[in-house]
Structures are given as structure tokens and as C-alpha cells.
From Swiss-Prot:
Record's keyword terms, sorted: Cell membrane, Membrane, Transmembrane, Transmembrane helix
GO MF, any single term: phosphoric diester hydrolase activity
A single GO BP: lipid metabolic process
Lipid bilayer topology: Multi-pass membrane protein
InterPro entries to which the protein is assigned, alphabetical: CTDL_fold, PLC-like_Pdiesterase_TIM-brl, Telomere_Capping_Maintenance
Descriptive protein name: Uncharacterized protein MT2135
TM stretches of this protein: 10-30, 45-65, 439-459
Domain of life: Bacteria
Main location: membrane
């Protein structure tokens, strides 16, 4: 069938499906983060299980993506049951207080060691219909391209690497970026997905673009290679592509002096993004240990954890009973979700509302508890999850004319306030314990007041630090934090 007729027929099918279904009500958000209903909400309310609605949604997403790819204005490609993917939404996001605050928080965390740093990330970042239609892309984890994800403040990406025979290589294998089973299962699910050498330039070009040259990203390479030649090919591609125009490398390289007995260098959790940037690097590469790529890729298998309970997560300080506080202090804790049809089929009784989804109500709890890395599926700028990850400035803060000093309010969010107002001051001692001064002080007197109780006047740099300060400052009505607005 010609492409135009196929698009028309598919769009008609989607429209008929939604006409037959009553629209679902939008649930109230406990954290007051505005979030649209699921694209398949109208199906979810009538189906006892997830599979039919997920399948319809995947079909609608594929049609919408093909509509955009053939040059139809994206606003006209917003179909029933499909995700709403428009350039206008991304442009609006880049002008929003959410974007400004996300960038502010990243800058605050630059001096923080990686064990405490928090990253906005995506799961199976590459698995999107934005670039091409393939079998695995049709069961997508994302709607946006890698560059578009980086545009909306994602700083941790995931690429799954397989070693497959390639048509363009007349059957010779190549390193392929694909969502499929591993080599023991013949890489089932992988077909004509792109080579790593085709995908990686999206990331390099973004890092080298004006306005992005100081950004640092975390790139997780999931190893489905298990082949010495494949690892050599990966390293060669990384070295060739992740470079600046002047030829200098963007890769933060493992220090051979820290090589472990398994032949790989563990990801150093004591280093900060500030130190990585100062070294000239912009990309930290992580994965499981494989000596064949250990010159470029850190081994994070001993420091990263990802087996917690999404559904059982509770607000700070309860968090997830799977892990104690010591785990958060010394490991890189990652939570991800999976929105694919394959996952729904593997759990046929799962309800349409996925209990493992990283929803806007869960994200603040995870941020407060110290989760280091989110692996979001289907991340879009207006879906509420980026906003839910914000812990510093309150909405539309700092307000012009409100004052030049930062105050953590009674609700834990920051506002601009007059420096001459009296408030308790946020203090932190040498052991990392947060407290507030016993008496209110003006901002100029905060440092001396903290010194008097054996602590330093400072500010939270992570969501967990902010939550720990709020636990002691909230009952006092809030506290000054050591931040002055630039003139």
C-alpha cells in the first residue's frame, strides 16, 4: 500500500478506536505537579489488563512518528492514543522556569562527588521511532531522538550494543544499537537497527554545539557484545567520534593505575563533574567489566544498583526498604521503568496503570531519598516528571524584586527573599549533619551564627541534602541558604 494511503488508513483506525472509548478522568497529583493523562487513558479505563492498550498505543505512536517523518507538520500528527510530540512543546520548555531550574540544579551539583550526584536519564534512550522504523523501534521506550532528549536536560543516556551480521557489510558483523535479547538468544529482536558509528555522532554533535560545550554526560553502554572483535570496534568508534573539531577527545578515560583484578577500572565515585570538566572531558562511559573496552569504559557493576522497588517507594525518609541509608551513601542507585509491549506481554495480568512506572508523584520521593540516576521511558518536556525532579526553586522563582537572598521555605522549596529579613540559617557541621541557628538572623549574620554552633553556613547541593535540611528547617518555618542571586 502506498505510504500516504497507509498513513490515512492508520489514522482513521486510531480515530475510530478513540470514538468508541469514553475519555478517562485525570487523577489529582499529590505533589501538585501538572501532568497530562496517559496517551492511552481512554483505553485504560475499560481494559482490565495492560496488553491491549499498550499495543494500541504502540501502533498509534508508530503512525504518528511516520507522519512526522514524511514532513507533515507535527501538530497534525498528534493522534488518539499516541504520545504528543511537537517542536512547540520543546521550544516552550526551553523558555520555562523548569528548564532554568534544572540547569541551576546541575550547576549546584558540579562540585559534588558522583556518589551523591543526581542525573536525569532515560532508559533505552536510543529505542525511538524518531529516526527510523524497525521491529524493535516499533516497541519504543522513547519518542524523542538522543539530541532532543539532551535538549530537555537529560544528561544520562543508555545505548544497548549488539554484534550482528550486517546487510551493508555483506554479512560481516557490526556493532549495532538495538533493543533485543543477547547473543545466547541469537540477538532476537534486532533486525536493521543502526550501527553505533551512526548513532554516536548525534551525541558528539550535541556536545560540540554552541551552548553545550561545557556539559558533562553519563553514557551507559549495555554490553550484549561478548566478542573480542566487537569490543575493539566499540573503542575505535568511541575514539573516532567522541572528539572536538580540533581533534581533542571528549572521553573521561579510566586511570590504569586504578585497574582492579578483573582487568577493569571501577567508576570512581569520589570524582565530581567539576573535576571531569577540568580534565577536558565531557563524556563518562560506563558499563559492565570487559577488558576489551576497559581503556575507555568504566566498570560500574560493583558500584551501581538497580534492583529496588518502584511500586513500593515511599516519601522521605521511608524511601525504599530494599536499601538502607548506607547504600545511598556509597553506591550509585538507579531506578528505571519499561513501557514496552514486550514487558507487558511478560506480565499478562498487569493492570493498565503500571505499578513500576516512574510517575510524577514518585519522582520527588526518589529525589529526596538520594536516587542518583533515573531511567525514564517516553520522557517528554510537558509530562511532569522533569518538574517533579526539581527540589530547589519553587515555581517561577526567583521572582524579580523579591530580594537577593535565597530562603528555603517551610515547604522545602526555595524562594527569593529580602536579605534584611530575620530567619534561621541553614548550617552543616563537619560530619554532614544539618541544623538551623537557634535564633533568626539577617542573611549577613548567618555565617557567624552558624560558626557559633560549630557549623558552616552553606546550601544544599542535592535533593537529598535539601530534604535533610528541610527535616530540621521546616518546623522552624524555613531557613536561609547560602546563595545570593547574581546582580
Amino acid at each position: 500500500m502506498p505510504r500516504a494511503r497507509w498513513l490515512q488508513s492508520a489514522a482513521l483506525m486510531g480515530a475510530l478506536a478513540v470514538v468508541l472509548i469514553t475519555a478517562a478522568p485525570v487523577a489529582a497529583d499529590a505533589y501538585q505537579v501538572p501532568a497530562p493523562p496517559s496517551p492511552t487513558a481512554s483505553c485504560d479505563v475499560i481494559s482490565p489488563v495492560a496488553i491491549p492498550c499498550v499495543a494500541l498505543g504502540k501502533f498509534a505512536d508508530a503512525v504518528a512518528a511516520e507522519c512526522r517523518r514524511v514532513g507533515v507538520p507535527d501538530a497534525r500528527c498528534v493522534l488518539p492514543l499516541a504520545h504528543r510530540v511537537t517542536q512547540a512543546a520543546r521550544d516552550a520548555y526551553l523558555q520555562s522556569w523548569v528548564h532554568r531550574t534544572a540547569r541551576f540544579q546541575d550547576a549546584l551539583q558540579d562540585p559534588v562527588p558522583l556518589r551523591e550526584t543526581q542525573w536525569l536519564g532515560t532508559h533505552n534512550s536510543f529505542n525511538s521511532l524518531s529516526d527510523s522504523f524497525t521491529v524493535s523501534h516499533a516497541d519504543s521506550n522513547q519518542q524523542l531522538s538522543l539530541a532532543q532528549q539532551l535538549d530537555i536536560d537529560v544528561r544520562a543516556l543508555e545505548l544497548d550494543l549488539h554484534y550482528l551480521p550486517r546487510l551493508e557489510g555483506h554479512g560481516a558483523p557490526g556493532v549495532t544499537v538495538c533493543h533485543g535479547l543477547g547473543p545466547k538468544n541469537a540477538n532476537l529482536g534486532c533486525t536493521v537497527e543502526p550501527l553505533l558509528a551512526t548513532v554516536l555522532p548525534q551525541i558528539a554533535n550535541w556536545l560540540n554545539a554552541p551552548g553545550h560545550t561545557e556539559e558533562v554526560i553519563l553514557l551507559y553502554l549495555e554490553d550484549q557484545l561478548k566478542n573480542a572483535s566487537a569490543y575493539e570496534s566499540v573503542v575505535a568508534t568511541l575514539d573516532q567520534v567522541l572528539r572536538r573539531a580540533d581533534g581533542t577527545s571528549l572521553i573521561y578515560r579510566p586511570n590504569p593505575a586504578r585497574r582492579a583484578t578483573n582487568g577493569c577500572v571501577p567508576l570512581p565515585l569520589d570524582v565530581s563533574r567539576e573535576e571531569i570538566r577540568a580534565s577536558g572531558a565531557r563524556a563518562v562511559l560506563v558499563g559492565s567489566c570487559a577488558p576489551g573496552w576497559s581503556a575507555a569504559v568504566f566498570d560500574w557493576s560493583g558500584v551501581e544498583l538497580e534492583s529496588g522497588s518502584n511500586s513500593g517507594y515511599r516519601p522521605y525518609p521511608a524511601c525504599d526498604a530494599t536499601y538502607g541509608r548506607g547504600v545511598y551513601a556509597w553506591r550509585l542507585v538507579r531506578y528505571y521503568e519499561d513501557s514496552t509491549l514486550a514487558t507487558a506481554l511478560a506480565n499478562p495480568t498487569r493492570p493498565p496503570a503500571n505499578p513500576q512506572a516512574l510517575t510524577p508523584p514518585k519522582v520527588p520521593a526518589m529525589t529526596d531519598c538520594g536516587v542518583n540516576l533515573f531511567g525514564f521511558d517516553q520522557l517528554l518536556p510537558e509530562d511532569g516528571r522533569i518538574q517533579a525532579s526539581l527540589w530547589s526553586w519553587a515555581p517561577d522563582e526567583p521572582r524579580a524584586g523579591a530580594g537577593a537572598c535565597a530562603l528555603q521555605g517551610a515547604d522545602g522549596r526555595w524562594v527569593a527573599a529580602s536579605c534584611g529579613d530575620p530567619h534561621p540559617a541553614a548550617c552543616r557541621d563537619a560530619a554532614g549533619r544539618w541544623t538551623v541557628t537557634p535564633a533568626p538572623v539577617v542573611f549577613a549574620g548567618a555565617a557567624l551564627a552558624c560558626t557559633a554552633i560549630g557549623a558552616d553556613f552553606t546550601l544544599p547541593r542535592t535533593g537529598n541534602q535539601n530534604a535533610r535540611l528541610h527535616a530540621v528547617a521546616g518546623p522552624a518555618g524555613g531557613a536561609w541558604v547560602h546563595y545570593l542571586l547574581p546582580p
